[in-house]
Regions:
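C-terminal motif of bacterial Sec signal peptides marking the signal peptidase cleavage site
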Residues: 16-19
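Extended ligand-binding regions for polar small-molecule ligands
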Residues: 21-23, 70-79, 159, 231-268
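Extracytoplasmic small-molecule ligand-binding "clamshell" domains
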Residues: 29-109, 255
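Short loop->beta-strand "edge-of-pocket" segments that line small-molecule binding or catalytic clefts
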Residues: 46-50, 145-160
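Periplasmic-binding protein-like
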Residues: 52, 128-135, 201, 205, ...
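Ligand-binding cleft/hinge of the Venus flytrap
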Residues: 60, 73-81, 161-180, 208-213
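Acidic, polar ligand-binding/catalytic clefts
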Residues: 83-147, 222-223
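A ligand-binding cleft/hinge motif common to bilobed small-molecule-binding domains
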Residues: 108-118, 166-167, 190-191, 195-225
Length: 281
């Protein structure tokens, strides 16, 4: 069984979302006793659609969904007496799944952007990331994102990495190789089918650390903007679910639960200065 706790100091510096500190001795019962959100059905089990192929954020382990994003949503929900059931759902159809009402919440390390906000509503941000490039020694001349202008690169389809590569190479570029999951995109690089992978720093750094024999290298480009993850809801939904999750996020950031979960997964609390030092090496 893979352990949750690992040291990813460089990773934490690149994409940590600063959270409010607080006493870690607070228990969930104090949060659960708070005022009930108007319209929320506390007797209902809400369905969460998640693309569980995105370690360490959300992935399958022993036939169950685990990961940092899972733990954050689960803790936020429990603090408000909200019951959840997590269902593994391919990312490509996840937005439509939520939009049609087949699921109540979308959980897939979803970057909040203006285009997606036209289709879905989002929770408050719970994590900060950026894009990252992965190469091998045979492509050591790739130093910046601009170097991928005419180079074949793999991405997970419909992700932020896919979108920024389209901006660089053009939407119809034959050099963009799209895959259903990030592990498949990485395997394409390792087999020599592409020169690079572009993906979220959270997943990229974890994969590189977990696969040392692949001898992968990471490239951070200063042009990559910060991205914020949020939980997705059907546009215009007004049954109190999103409000409850936002209350829960605020609660776990205040009582120290967020910091505890972050440390379990990344080896350091958010905003740790030691992490920033390690990342610069």
């Amino acid at each position: 069984m893979r352990t949750k706790s690992f040291s990813l100091l460089a990773l934490a510096a690149v994409f940590t979302l600063s959270a409010c500190g607080g006493s870690q001795n607070s228990n969930s019962n104090s949060a659960a006793s708070g005022a009930k959100t108007a319209g929320l059905d506390v007797n209902k089990t809400y369905i969460v659609a998640t693309d569980a192929s995105y370690a360490p954020m959300e992935y399958m382990e022993n036939n169950a969904v685990v990961g940092f994003s899972h733990d954050i949503l689960d803790a936020a929900a429990k603090s408000q007496n909200v019951k959840l059931e997590f269902v593994n759902t391919p990312f490509k159809g996840l937005f439509a799944n939520v939009d049609k009402g087949d699921s109540d919440i979308g959980l897939a390390s979803i970057t909040i952007n203006d285009e997606r906000k036209q289709q879905l509503d989002f929770s408050d941000p719970y994590f900060e990331a950026t894009q990252m490039i992965v190469t091998t020694d045979r492509n050591a001349n790739i130093k910046t994102f601009a170097d991928l202008k005419t180079r074949p690169a793999s991405v997970q389809a419909a992700t932020s990495g896919d979108l920024i590569l389209q901006d660089l190479q053009g939407k119809d570029s034959q050099n963009i190789k799209r895959f259903e999951t990030m592990p498949l995109a990485f395997k394409e690089l390792e087999s020599g089918g592409v020169d690079a992978v572009v993906g979220d720093s959270s997943v990229v750094a974890y994969y590189v650390k977990q696969n040392p024999n692949a001898k992968l290298n990471t490239v951070v480009d200063p042009s990559f903007v910060k991205e914020h993850y949020g939980f997705a809801f059907k546009k215009g939904r007004n049954d109190g679910l999103r409000e409850a999750i936002n209350k829960g996020l605020a609660q776990i950031k205040t009582d120290g639960t967020y910091d505890k979960i972050h440390t379990q997964w990344f080896g350091t609390p958010p905003g740790n200065s030691a992490a920033a030092s390690s990342a610069s090496q």
